[in-house]
Amino acid sequence: TDPGHLQDVXVAINDPKXGVFVNRK
């Protein structure tokens, strides 16, 4: 996944698997 890909700003966290952003709700 593109490290600049944000699913939701503010709640997105940097996944240690490679800079993958995961949406936390």
UniProtKB/Swiss-Prot annotation:
Its main location: secreted. One of its GO terms (molecular function) is metal ion binding. Keywords: Allergen, Apoplast, Manganese, Metal-binding, Secreted. The three different mass spectrometry results appear to arise from different glycosylation variants. Transmembrane segments: none annotated. Coiled coil: none annotated. Disulfide bonds: none annotated. It is found in: Secreted, Extracellular space, Apoplast. Signal peptide: none annotated. One of its GO terms (cellular component) is apoplast. Oligomer (believed to be a pentamer but probably hexamer). Belongs to the germin family. May play a role in plant defense. Probably has no oxalate oxidase activity even if the active site is conserved. This is Germin-like protein. The lineage of its organism: Eukaryota, Viridiplantae, Streptophyta, Embryophyta, Tracheophyta.
